[in-house]
Structure formats: C-alpha cells, structure tokens
From Swiss-Prot:
Annotated ranges, domain Chitin-binding type-1: 1-36
Catalytic activity: Random endo-hydrolysis of N-acetyl-beta-D-glucosaminide (1->4)-beta-linkages in chitin and chitodextrins
Taxonomic placement: Eukaryota, Viridiplantae, Streptophyta, Embryophyta, Tracheophyta
Keyword Hydrolase attached: yes
Paired cysteines (S-S): C3-C12, C5-C18, C11-C25, C29-C34, C66-C115, C128-C136, C218-C250
Active site: E110 (proton donor)
Function: Defense against chitin-containing fungal pathogens.
Native source organism of the sequence: Dioscorea japonica (Japanese yam)
Listed name of the protein: Acidic endochitinase
The family this protein is said to belong to: Belongs to the glycosyl hydrolase 19 family. Chitinase class I subfamily.
Length: 250
C-alpha cells in the first residue's frame, strides 16, 4: 500500500492509508504531518553520537572470527542511516542519545555484540505465516537476519517493498548485503513504532522490548533475556552521558 493522498494535509500510516488521527500520524507514520512524541530541537547528528570509539566498544567484545566483523561496520551503518533521516535526529540531544542507546542495546542483544548475521539455529524455526497478502516461497526461509534479526515472511515482504528488494524470493539478501541489512533494522525501528515509544516520555525502554520480543520476554516469560537488554541500554546511556529514564523492564 502506498498513500495516494495530499501529504501536506494527511498522514500516510505505516500500512499506507491516509488520515489524521493517531492511528495514521502516530507510530510508523511514513509521510505528512506525523506526530512527534516529544518537543525540543537538538543539534547532534547520528555520527556525532555513534563515534568509532562507541562502535568499537561494542564490536570488540565479540570474537575475532565473528562473521559480522566486516559486515557490521560503522561506515555501513551510517550509509544505511542516510536513508532514514528521522532516525536519531528527533527531539532533544538527550532524547537522541537515548534512542541510539536503545537501538544498540537491542542490536547488541540480537547479534551478540555485532557478531551474528543470521539467527543461530534459525533453520529449526518456521517463520512462515502465510496469507493471500503475504505468501511464502517454500524454498526460502524467513528466520532472523541482520542487526535487528528481521524475521517472518510478512516482515521480509514489507521491508522489501520499502527498501527495493525481493523479500519473498530473496530473504537471504538481508544476510548478504550489509547496507540492506542495516536498513531493515531501521525500517523495523521506525515502521513498527519502536522509535515512537522510546521518545515518548510516558513510555520507555520496556515498551521497546514489548514491540521487538514481548511475547517471548515480557510479563515474566524470560526475565533473564529481558534484563540483559535493559543492562545494555543502561550501559550505553552511561557511555553517552544520559539518564535512561523510567519504565525500563516489561
């Protein structure tokens, strides 16, 4: 779905429909007068916050023979970020730092400090939820790949439409092309409303876990995994010199 409306007046929702309510202008809004959950105008850029030193501090904790060593690089990340100018650039400088700390907390947890490109034992899981709108290619697998471990056929298809790759027939590209791989993590972050909840002063890091893996980790299901994410978030907030805010667990 792509919005065919006047985006000077209407918001284009994450599902490609036009309107002016929270459902259209809130989390995942693609174009138009999208609602910002916060106010303020910082000046820091993503590359100001994600220094090479910050990057190396994460990547250096993974083994030297990790498949992600030459795949997950700061330059590849920054190239992907240029396709999503709204990432890490909203609200105050403190908000920007918190958003980036949250993003890398999840990336560190999902990839083992930028080590794994593909989900370990991913072949053992079936990530096909077939429908008329979202078919599956029986010869392909839709397990986790990339910094945010993109999973499920419908996410591959939707990300592919926005990022111009064939998510149905070539999901493997997310494990092959580092720029596309990073872009899928940013697609998920923004389109699924993760960015919105970390910037919303009434929510917080716990709400980001709920979107990314809430069914597996929140409400007492896997507290150790959930608290590992919280720990990384607190660590990166401390490195960036910003308070982590409230509502950290889920």
């Amino acid at each position: 779905q792509n919005c065919q409306c006047d985006t000077t007046i209407y918001c284009c929702s994450q599902h490609g429909y036009c309107g002016n309510s929270y459902d259209y202008c809130g989390p995942g809004c693609q174009a138009g007068p999208c609602w910002d959950p916060c106010e303020g105008d910082g000046t820091l850029t993503v590359s100001d916050i994600v220094t090479q030193e910050f990057w190396d501090g994460i990547a250096s904790q993974a083994a030297a023979n990790c498949p992600g060593k030459s795949f997950y690089t700061r330059s590849n990340f920054l190239e992907a970020v240029s396709a999503y100018p709204g990432f890490g650039t909203k609200c105050t400088d403190e908000d920007r730092k918190r958003e980036i700390a949250a993003y890398f907390a999840h990336v560190t947890h999902e990839t083992g400090h930028l080590c794994y490109i593909e989900e370990r034992d991913g072949h053992a899981n079936n990530y096909c939820q077939e429908s008329q709108q979202y078919p599956c290619n029986p010869n392909k697998e839709y397990f986790g790949r990339g910094p945010m471990q993109l999973s499920w056929n419908y996410n591959y298809i939707d990300a592919g439409k926005e990022l111009h790759f064939d998510g149905l027939n070539d999901p493997d590209i997310v494990g092959r092309d580092p720029i596309i791989s990073f872009k899928t993590s940013l697609w998920f972050w923004i389109r699924k409303g993760v960015q919105y909840v970390i910037l919303d002063p009434n929510q917080g890091f716990g709400a980001t876990i709920r979107i990314i893996n809430g069914g597996q980790e929140c409400d007492g299901h896997n507290t150790a995994q959930m608290m590992a994410r919280v720990g990384y978030y607190q660590e990166y907030c401390a490195q960036l010199g910003v308070s982590p805010g409230n509502n950290l667990p889920c």
